[in-house]
Amino acid sequence: LIMKINQILDKIDEHQLYVPAFQREYVWKRKHVKSLMSSLINEYPTGTILSWETSSPPELKGKSKYHETQGAVKLILDGQQRITSLYMILKGEIPPYYTEKEIIQDTRNLHVNVETLELEYYIKQKMGNNPLWVNLTDIFKKEIKAHQLVKDLQVKLGDDENIEDERIDLIHENFNKIESIKDRDFLEQSIPIKATIREAID
């Protein structure tokens, strides 16, 4: 099965995709998320997720409750660290199956240099006065657009220096490259609905 990243995140919001309570907590650190986002930007493979479709799920993580009227739902058995990281970066929020307190290291606030595609967590001295450094989440949420950034950069440079066309094209191209991550295919292996919980986790 192939699912796009934004479809996976939408299914979480639409109560169709859950994390079982027996899954370990979110333990990824910033370096892991930086590496994942770098792989996605460079279009490298990022592994598969393993899900289990069931109409009798075990206890679910967080406040999620299953109602029989929902029919079959999917549980993430493997890939939860990646999915949680993507949810936090693309949406800028903690996914519904966690609370803020349960997130050991908040991996949001990852910035990208839209000219070089370098990724770093926010450092005021390096980024505070440089329009090229943008919070990745702001790009995914369309809170900043390439043309606006080019304008901000021109203001910073002043009237004496014009931005070269090649540089403008590169910034637009990099914005598109980042925005296209949400449409990237994620391979999903699905355990059949008739499997028992023991078979699913084996």
Descriptions of predicted regions:
Residues K4-R30, K34-D202:
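Basic- and aromatic-enriched surface patches that contact anionic nucleotides/nucleic acids
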